[in-house]
Each structure stands twice: as C-alpha cells, then as structure tokens.
C-alpha cells in the first residue's frame, strides 16, 4: 500500500516536472516569436520618394542652357496623409493622379499650380530636359532611359550623369513600408542642373541658322569663328521630334543623320585650293582665255558660260568661277604638292569633335589617280572622286578668310 503511494507520488512529481518544462519551452517559444514580430510591426525603416534624378546642363558659349531650359512644379505625396480632392485640383493629369492615389502608394505628379506643402506634400521645381523645340538637336543628341544615346548626351554621358543629384523626400516607415506621418520628413533638393559642359555654340546664331534652314529639304548649315575656328552653329535638316524617335528612325529622309558631318561632292569652292596651289607655285599672275570649253585627253570639259569668259587672270577667274581657267592652271602643278596642300587643309581627314561625333573623312584622290589628266582636270574645280563634309568646307573657308 505504501509502495503504491510512493510510486504514485513519483509519477505525480514527474508529471509536474514535465508540465513545468513544457511551460518553460512554450514561454521561450513565445518570447522568441515575439522578438521576430517586433521588427515587422515596430522597427523603423525609410521610404524615399524620388521626384527626379537630375543631369548636368549643356550650355552654349555664353552660358545659355541648351537643355533644362524650362522648369515645372512637381509634387511628391503620401496618399494617406492628404485629401484627394483638395490636392487633385493641382494635378496636370487628374485621371492619372486619381489612379495613383487609389493605389495608396506614395507618388509624384506634375502640377499646374503650386500646392501648399505639408507633412504629406513636398513640392519640387524640376527642369524639363528637352522642350517642344530643341535647339541644336543634332549636336545635343538625346537620352533614353536616363542614358545618352547620341550627340553630346552620349559623348559626355558619364560627366552629365556624374553630376546628377536627386530631388527626393524621405520618410520613416514601419516594417511593412507604411509611411509614419508625424515622425518628420527629410527633403533633398538638387542644384546639379547648374553644372555641366560648355560648348562653342552661340545659341543666337544657331537659332538664325535653324530658322532660315528650316525650308531646306535635306542639307546643313555650319558657321564658325574665322579667327579661332570655333563652331558657332551647326544645323542639319530635316530635324526630328524627341517625342517621335521611332518615327524618325523610319523616316526615309533620315532626319537623325547629322548632314554637316557627312561627305558630299565638293564643287567650285575647291577652286580656292587650286588657286592657293597656283600662288604657292608662283603662278599667281597666270592668264588664260576661256572659250567655254577645253579638251583633255579626248574628254570635253565645259565652263558654265558656254560662250566663254575670254582672257582672265586668277582674280577674274575666281570671281566668274571659270572651270576651264582652273583646269588649265592645274596642269602645270606638282601633283604631290597639290594633293598635300588639299590634305593639309583638312580634305581626306576625319573631324573628331568628341566621342560619338566625328565628321566623315570624305574622299581625297590618290596621287596615282590624279596622275590621270582627266581626273586632275575634274579635281581642279571640285569634281570627280573628291568629296568632303560641310564642316571640312567651313574649315577651308576659315583658313583662307583668317589669313
């Protein structure tokens, strides 16, 4: 009897100890689980609302911006902290605002007017990268998804993006990412737009070139400083819309091409080079009687004045742009020196402006090719195989006019 009571007591004691151990285990489990829940419910994190990642500005020579020229107001809001109808009246696109507001997530919208700032509303003044009409677009180029694709935007992409700065507002949030209104906010406003790169372009001259060149179906205008050679304006036609890049890619007129950097037949302006070589070889007093045509190895070459210009010196022949005069003048030239002069004036050589913007070398006939009399005759007044870019021709004009 006593033994049974002892055994029963031992069993009861074991059960008590087991229950106590189980209670301790459960308590530990609850404590550890509670600790896991604490970050999710109470631990603070941050939520950033970025209105814009700015990029440096491209300026003309007078520090007039070619991009970032117009500024607009944008507002970053926390839907849970603002009245929808009160703020929506400031939105440029109310339908888009409504959709974003209903999502409950913080967002940024463009404003038609400046809303009052509050804990849940932060206003930023942000420049538009490109406006409706972009000046010097073939030099400026364009960006896609924040990265430079062509022009200076491509060439100096790292510089312009390296100068980037964010316009953003930062809030504290709970572990679920919900903004904690009332805990304050941190606002960062970027001044990066004032930094960037400076070009040699003069926006005033560029505007004039683009205005009067807009009627050109296909072509280019280049304007340079005679003394320094600085490019003051460079315009290519036709232009394109930044909002319709895909359409421009499909356009048979190829508006994305910078025609100032593509090579074409040169024509009579090359007579300047022929005249320079004539002077260099001591033939500045050369006289020739133009009859309207001349024959070289059985091939007829005509002057634009079919009945001829008569007897002319170099100045008169240049004034009249007489083809046969320069054909005759060139026949006495040292061909190697003649070609070398053309090369020294930029023909047959690429124009490297910056990474991604390089003018074509064009075609400068070889000495062997110019040894053929008919080829030399064509070369003397800018015909035949010779090609050059509008930029190369501008350089030629600057070299001569500068002297």
Predicted regions and their residues:
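Periplasmic/cell-envelope proteins involved in peptidoglycan metabolism and beta-lactam response
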Residues: 1-245, 286, 339-344
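Beta-lactam-recognizing serine transpeptidase/beta-lactamase-like catalytic domain environment
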Residues: 65-67, 225-268, 273-403
